Amino acid sequence: METVTEEETKEGIEEVEQPPPRAKYTSHILTTTKIQTPVRIEYDPMKDDPPPAIITPSYEPLWKKNEHWGDRCDPPVLHDETEFIRIYGQNNNGISESTGLNYDDTFKHMKEANADIFCINETHADKMNAKNNRVLESSRRRMFRSKDSQYCNLVTSSSIAPITKYTKPGGNMMGICGSLVSRMRRRIEDKYGRWCGFALLGKDNREIIVLTAYNVPQETPAGDDTLHAQQTSLYLLDGEVDPNPRKNFIRDLHTLVKATKDNNQDLILMGDFNEVVGDDPKMMAKVLMAGDLTDVHAHKHGQAHIATYIRGRRRVDYCFVSPRILDHVLRCGFEAFHARK
């Protein structure tokens, strides 16, 4: 077998021009897309809906929502219980006026709610004013003594301090209706206008004390006719030096609640206490401990950051009950603001 060297190849073979070597890979055709700058659209907030880019979900706390909270206690919901007592509380921030129409409206709402006991805080009614008493009594007769209505007993409280106007800051009212009227043993009133209520006779001959209360929000008088100023003047007449109406409310309510427990009486305490109960251990928390009272709404539904004052963000209205009453609470809740108009 012969071999051919490189020199022999070059001399014996004619060289032919070769095409350039082909690449060992396949070329790819690249396509490019022109990226255009988006055109900015002018957004007119007075005419256009907000574009999606600026809509961000946000958490709305409970105190901002005007919604029902807790159980719904409308009569159709309660048709399955054979016997129950419905207690309804409200802070109207003033219902006293010379025509009695506001009283009529309030009583109408209480009848529509089928309230057996109703509690109204801040009536702005002056119990020392004879005309106001006549207007209130006339309204009660119109709304509760007609043929299609049940009877109602009322108790009210306001400070005994004199003022020059028809309306008087503060004031409380409670009504008991229907068959409960026959169980009334006595009315409970307070000359400082802090609370009022009834002592009712239970089925086991044990008294049930039902109270509605209102504590002043201010630490200073802030005016000549405010409830703070009224109570301060009365405490001074009683011989107290530098009285504090807010603290005196706690002091005297503590005494009343403790006496109720010592007398083996059951207690239902409702009202506007103008504090977040529990924030200050020297205020309403002290009263609850004295009577072994429980917040029924927190007991049933847990603690929640809800507002019970339409221009506020805190819960200042409560219903407290003694242990034996707590065992019989069926439902409880807060209606939305202006739910009854």
Feature locations, PLM:
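A shared catalytic/ligand-binding motif for oxyanion handling
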Residues: 1-341
